[in-house]
Amino acid sequence: LEKQGKVALQYGPTEGYGPLREWVAQHKSTSDVTISPNEVLIVSGSQQALDMLGKLFIDQNSKVLVESPSYLGALQSFSMYEPTYVAIDTDEGGLIPAEVSAEKSAGARFIYALPNFQNPTGLTLSAERRQELVERCAAAHIPVIEDDPYGELRYAGEPQPSLLHLGRKAGATVIHLGTFSKVLAPGLRLGYIIAPTAIIDKLVQIKQAADLHSSTVTQMAIYEAIKNNFLETHLPVVRELYKRQCHYMLDAMAEHFPEGVHWTQPEGGMFLWVTLPQNMNAQELLQKAIARHVAFVPGEPFDATGNAKTNTLRLSFVTVSEERIREGIAILGQLIREEI
């Protein structure tokens, strides 16, 4: 504020603070795919991006393809515009590209996917599945919304190519969403969209009508923090912390959960997905867990089509201590055993 107060406290361009857009473009470019700053729009968190994309693409009863299960926040944003959801099935490898059939994709406005450490399952798409997905979407002329809030939080396995980069090579339209919430702080409420300029131009109009521009002070502060490679030293610390937290939870589940309960093994991110025995109801289990001061999210709200399994739930391991993780999982395991 002392050095650039007149810029920081004045109205700014809707597209975002220029140096930050340039940083994002450079950060997301590779040796064979170059992103232009003109393809970057700064938004007030990727949640705003989801709402803006819903406003741009969805009319009442428009067909929208989503993973089953999918991110609840996206479903809430899109549902405001009353689409017709078509579920794309998932398995232990995440989204199944073959499910993006000609019948399902006909007339679809877009497909929404989280290829890295998906919320809620924690699963990651393989490079082969990513390639098949963008090729199918290119052939069907369906835009892909790649939501990637957790991509920087890998702590096991090998990094996979982004749908953005694969899509550029395959001729697919990919709209990439990123955020500073998961790598810096969620209270900053700042993210970005990378898309072809024709789409960015439309989104700029939508954003200008919504809030003129994202906070210039916040944009400049984030740029000052990251411009000199702060993330290169900060992210390894975050990854190591989340890795430990994840292992604490997985170890506790292996110790306390009974036979017949299954869960995912995330390579990064913040969540894992639990499947209880068929006869159990996660919503009913939640009420008993809350009485013991343990909380989780039942799986049903993550399904867009109303056909969710009632025996699934999401756990998060990133905001609690090892002691609390082990205590909570022990209680949850006891409650599951009592239900069985």
Regions found by a protein language model. Name each.
Residues E2-H141, I145, G151-K169, Y242, ...:
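Conserved core of the PLP fold type I
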Residues P149, L153, I290-R314:
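Conserved PLP cofactor-binding pocket of PLP-dependent enzymes
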Residues R168-E240:
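Conserved core segment of the aminotransferase class I/II
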Residues A170, A291, N307-I340:
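PLP-dependent enzyme catalytic core of the Aspartate aminotransferase-like
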Residues I194, W273-T275, S316-V318:
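Short hydrophobic/aromatic beta-strand micro-patches
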Residues Y223, E240-L250, H262-T275, L285-K288:
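Conserved glycine-rich beta-strand-loop-beta hairpin in the small C-terminal domain of fold type I
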Residues M280-L285, E323-E327:
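Short, conserved charged micro-motifs
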